[in-house]
Amino acid sequence: MDAGVAVKADVAVKMKRERPFKGIRMRKWGKWVAEIREPNKRSRLWLGSYSTPEAAARAYDTAVFYLRGPTATLNFPELLPCTSAEDMSAATIRKKATEVGAQVDAIGATVVQNNKRRRVFSQKRDFGGGLLELVDLNKLPDPENLDDDLVGK
């Protein structure tokens, strides 16, 4: 393989890791931010700061859809906004984009919390080198083994 091709491939992989989606970037402290340049202007629309790259990318997609229409290149084309791309002010576009990004962030945070709860629950059950025996609380006690259960077998 040519050395120049290898360097270009390494740069492409690094860029993909740093910017997995169009219109977003990662801050030094780990937050993902989204912004977009307004058409025919030098100014940028700030779309917010998010916990996940997906949330930032969805905010970007919403803004680019309303700015450039349905022919715009989107990160998630299968998730087009339900409304039509009418002419809106920059403030309205920013508001819609931040709402979408915040919703995606909230869903992501809920999933993370649920996964943490599952891990804590499974750690509590796994104790002493094996899983605890789960007891059916709806089952009536067996009178023959009642004395054994009280003594501890």
Swiss-Prot record:
Gene Ontology CC annotations of this record: nucleus
SUPFAM superfamilies for this protein: DNA-binding domain
CDD domains xref list: AP2
DNA-binding region per Swiss-Prot/TrEMBL record: 20-77
First and last residue of the signal peptide: none
Keyword S-adenosyl-L-methionine carried by entry: no
A Gene Ontology molecular function term of the record: transcription cis-regulatory region binding
Membrane spanning stretches: none
Record keywords, A-Z: Activator, DNA-binding, Ethylene signaling pathway, Nucleus, Transcription, Transcription regulation
A Pfam short name: AP2
Main location: nucleus
Any one GO BP annotation for this protein: defense response to bacterium
Family annotation (InterPro entries): AP2/ERF_dom, AP2/ERF_dom_sf, DNA-bd_dom_sf
Subcellular compartments: Nucleus
Gene3D superfamilies linked to this entry: AP2/ERF domain
Sequence similarity: Belongs to the AP2/ERF transcription factor family. ERF subfamily.
Function: Probably acts as a transcriptional activator. Binds to the GCC-box pathogenesis-related promoter element. May be involved in the regulation of gene expression by stress factors and by components of stress signal transduction pathways.
Name the UniProt record assigns to this protein: Ethylene-responsive transcription factor ERF011
